[in-house]
Amino acid sequence: MSSPFKTQSRFLIGSAAAALCTAASAAPLLVTVSVTNLAPTNSISFAPLRLGFNAGTFDAFNIGQTATAPIISVAEGGSGAAWLPAFAAADPTATIGSVDGLLTPGLTRSATFTVDPAVNKFFTFGAMAVPSNDFFIGNDSPTEYRLFNNAGGLAISSINIKANEIWDAGSEVFDPAAAAFVGNNSLRTPQNSVVAFNFAEFFGFNGLTTAAGYVFNSQLTANSDVYRINFSVAAVPEPGTYALLTAGLLSVGWVVRRRREKQPL
C-alpha cells in the first residue's frame, strides 16, 4: 500500500514536470529562413526578401488587379518601403523582417526570427527579381503558405518557385535603360496595367552588364527553378523560467529523499 507522502510526492513531481512541458510548448520558436537563388549562372538575381510571419490578413496584391503601393515598393527597386509598414498596420502582431543582401545565382543567405506559432501560422513574402522594371516573387493569397500546424510544428519545410511563377506588377513600362540592376531605376515610366505572370521579358536584358559585374543571360524556361525558401526551427532559450522549474523539481526530489530516510524500516 502506498504511503500518503509517496502519493503527494508523485503528485508534486508530476505537477512540476507538467509545468515544465507546458512552458516549453507555449514558448515562441526561433525560425531560420534560408533563401537560395537556383537560377542558372549569369541569369536573374533577387533583391532582399521581405517577409512576415502572420495571421493571414495582409494581402499585398491580387492577380489581374492593379498593383498596390506596398507591392510596387517591392517590385520597383526592392526596398519594400511601403510594404513593411503596410504589413505592420494590417497585422500588428506579425513578425516582420528581411533576409538582407543581393542574391545572385547560386548564393544562399539566411536570417533568424522569433515567432509565436500559435498566433502567426502563415508566411508571406516578396522580393524583386532583377534585372527588371517591376518583376517580383511573392504569394498572391495571404493564407497560401501555412507554416505551422495546430501543434506548433512546421507544416512545410520549404517553398520552391519556378520561372513561370514570377510576377510582373504591371506598374512600369519595360525599358532596359530604366531597369534595376542594368540601368537607371529612377527613370520610371508608369504602365498602368495589372499584376500578371511574366518571365519572357528577361530575355530582353540579354547581353547587358549587371551591377554585380556579370553579363546577363536569362536562359530561363517556364519550369526553371529560380528560388527556394527553407525553414528550420529551434526552441527559444528561457534560462530564468527553466532554471526555476528545474530547481522546483530538484527540491521535490530532495523532500522525497528526506522523507524516505525518516520512514521506519
Language model features: what each stretch is:
Residues 3, 27, 114-116, 219-221:
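A general structural signal for short secondary-structure junctions and capping/turn motifs
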Residues 9, 13, 17-28, 228-251:
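Short, threonine-centered small-residue motifs that mark membrane-proximal processing/anchoring sites
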Residues 254-265:
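C-terminal membrane-anchoring or membrane-association module
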